[in-house]
């Protein structure tokens, strides 16, 4: 391996003259008014930069009050050995609001009027690499966490850790991806000169932020942000297992190695291997095995299942899986399964059309196995053949026999829930009261007074509804182990709004209402157990995440924890007003660590508006 390292490094060291660096730039304005800042590179005014890089061009305009944080590229030239950011500023951070031009110089910010320029050398943000995947133009519009990750390096923001969330991948990597772990990664310094050979080196994880890690190359100062599910990240010794003869993979350090080793590669390699790799915790082969399993899904495109009608919750319809993305599935009602003319897709998001998007997690309360409606006597809107098919399934289950499914049916076993303790289940009674986040609402920022209306035959399922004259009309089936039901008194205890029953007059008090209705509360041990305090403490105000909008579930957005209410977090979608905030249980599959979308090639919606 030593010869390969020296040969490869010697071959390419002389062909690449500089390495790109990122500068985090903080611009402060003395005046308490919204100001405008336009940043242009040297190329804009015809000045000659000593090593022109056509990829580093363009300009951007930003608006903010008091302060803007952004980043720009610079070069580290081996010949000159210095860092150099570059750019023109046009700004109106002045007493009279008139625009001033300011050319940035490393030594001084004089002449900037009320503007102050502060620079920080930042780590490189590496885009996720997906081998053998076609490019998707939709992903050109996806939002990236680059700016916030650079702010994290300055201690100005943070993220909810992966281990705080409910399971959101089909494979769990929490135990192997940790700070201090050493792994193999691709060195892209050689890409232009090494078409048929992949060059790798070793790096150590310094910080973990969601599915992004801040890593540093062994034996170099270079740091970079990498998605752990990128095809650029490997367990240690992966190269030897993937390419035993090392015909297609070689090891070589990044070009920006520590200066004292640039002319002594033998000592450099020995120091890296003996001093920083041998005996250290490394990313195991199980990591690579786990990544390979991510492409294997429990379900398949074309399978049919039963889907609750979100606009008429007393009805179930037949739907097909159109796309699969990790645990999330795009499902829709198709002409193939519907007994009448399909509703207009503009009025019904669950109906298939060329652009239909109805994305839900595989554990969503909206979906049921084939035969659920027949087993439980629930209203089913389907073709005659399907109804007859599911009636046979229901009869087989009733007789204790194995049902005969079609090959494309999603079965009860595929959507199985955890068993319920029979002793606890006996405590459940029709009429018992609880508090509910309405999963069919257009707003998810309060709780409602609700009741158990009836039992389903399928174990653990109930028909529930919000108290009031429309309780039956708006009722729906749900498994007792869910993220929407909470015990009586939860809203008051955790400072949330409790919506009283429709047509209720006066001030609502639970004790008075229960006495008036001659009702009792659903016992505490029927609800999901409260997570440990250690886990709840990982959800702090100001931490960032990705969240699926429960009103329009095809959209996953960058978001921030605004407040914490026991096991519920109030989430604000970045750039949106607080009226659009939504409450999520910490076990919800609709909240995700940062980096989930890019890891699954799913579009992360940009914030509605930028202020940096």
UniProtKB/Swiss-Prot annotation:
<keyword id="KW-0158">Chromosome</keyword>
<dbReference type="GO" id="GO:0005634">
    <property type="term" value="C:nucleus"/>
</dbReference>
<dbReference type="GO" id="GO:0040025">
    <property type="term" value="P:vulval development"/>
</dbReference>
<comment type="function">
    <text>Synthetic multivulva class B (synMuvB) protein required to repress the induction of vulval development by Ras signaling. Unlike other synMuv proteins it does not associate with the multiprotein DRM complex and the NuRD-like complex. Interaction with methylated histone H3 is essential for vulva development. It has a role in maintaining genome stability.</text>
</comment>
<protein>
    <recommendedName>
        <fullName>Protein lin-61</fullName>
    </recommendedName>
</protein>
<keyword id="KW-0677">Repeat</keyword>
<dbReference type="Pfam" id="PF02820">
    <property type="entry name" value="MBT"/>
</dbReference>
<dbReference type="GO" id="GO:0045892">
    <property type="term" value="P:negative regulation of DNA-templated transcription"/>
</dbReference>
<keyword id="KW-0539">Nucleus</keyword>
<feature type="repeat" description="MBT 4">
    <location>
        <begin position="508"/>
        <end position="607"/>
    </location>
</feature>
<dbReference type="GO" id="GO:0003682">
    <property type="term" value="F:chromatin binding"/>
</dbReference>
<dbReference type="GO" id="GO:0042393">
    <property type="term" value="F:histone binding"/>
</dbReference>
<comment type="subunit">
    <text>Interacts preferentially with histone H3 that is dimethylated or trimethylated at 'Lys-9'.</text>
</comment>
<feature type="repeat" description="MBT 1">
    <location>
        <begin position="143"/>
        <end position="249"/>
    </location>
</feature>
<feature type="repeat" description="MBT 3">
    <location>
        <begin position="381"/>
        <end position="501"/>
    </location>
</feature>
<dbReference type="InterPro" id="IPR050548">
    <property type="entry name" value="PcG_chromatin_remod_factors"/>
</dbReference>
<feature type="repeat" description="MBT 2">
    <location>
        <begin position="263"/>
        <end position="380"/>
    </location>
</feature>
<dbReference type="GO" id="GO:0000785">
    <property type="term" value="C:chromatin"/>
</dbReference>
<dbReference type="InterPro" id="IPR004092">
    <property type="entry name" value="Mbt"/>
</dbReference>
